[in-house]
């Protein structure tokens, strides 16, 4: 699944992957106005089987949805550069904040797989998550008091989003090995001014006791 990185930052087929999937709803479309998905392979035989299945089950997007994704692809490179640059600034700022216990961003040298990401990616993307030292209550307080970051699920669009995975996107994983920490906050960093985004998150964190 190359949704978070997109072909602009990482090309899994060049690293030996047989099949790569993308949610075109996210960065490829990039504007929160289309729903779609893409399956890519360099194996022609497999590609023919996929085309047959697509035709047989009717999983065909509308012409207008295709237009929206193609429009998004025209600006994909410049958007991903800005997403990555903004996310790097935000990750560094979060790492220095006393209310933040841990920051998860592959662009940070502290990330356990930073070396792998640096080797196979040309940028580190726009997804940043962090754990609040004050636990779930602190995380819920933060996501409820940002102004530029919109409290919403989804990701990968030009606007910045913030959410509490334990209560939102990953709620169904509660009680399973895939359960996320209750103190976790996830940010889909947009292309707004980085200083404004840092100030927004800092203000929300500074509210915490």
Regions found by a protein language model. Give the residues of each.
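A common structural junction motif
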Residues: 57-58, 146-154, 204-209
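Active-site beta-loop-alpha junctions enriched in small/polar residues
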Residues: 3-5, 9, 108, 133, ...
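Conserved PLP-enzyme active-site core in the AAT-like
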Residues: 1-99, 104
């Amino acid at each position: 699944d190359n949704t978070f990185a997109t072909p602009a930052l990482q090309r899994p087929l060049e690293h030996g992957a047989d099949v790569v999937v993308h949610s075109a709803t996210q960065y490829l479309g990039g504007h929160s106005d289309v729903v779609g998905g893409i399956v890519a392979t360099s194996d022609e035989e497999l590609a023919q089987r996929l085309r047959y299945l697509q035709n047989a089950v009717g999983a065909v997007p509308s012409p207008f949805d295709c237009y929206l994704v193609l429009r998004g692809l025209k600006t994909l490179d410049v958007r991903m550069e800005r997403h990555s640059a903004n996310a790097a600034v935000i990750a560094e700022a979060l790492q220095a904040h006393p209310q933040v216990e841990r920051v998860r961003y592959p662009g940070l040298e502290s990330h356990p797989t930073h070396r792998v990401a640096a080797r196979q990616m040309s940028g580190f993307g726009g997804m940043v998550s962090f754990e609040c030292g004050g636990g779930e209550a602190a995380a819920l307080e933060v996501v409820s008091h940002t102004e530029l970051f919109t409290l919403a699920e989804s990701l990968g669009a030009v606007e910045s989003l913030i959410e509490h995975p334990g209560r939102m996107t990953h709620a169904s994983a509660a009680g399973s090995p895939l359960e996320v920490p209750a103190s976790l906050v996830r940010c889909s960093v947009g292309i707004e001014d980085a200083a404004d985004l840092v100030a927004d998150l800092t203000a929300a964190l500074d509210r915490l006791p």
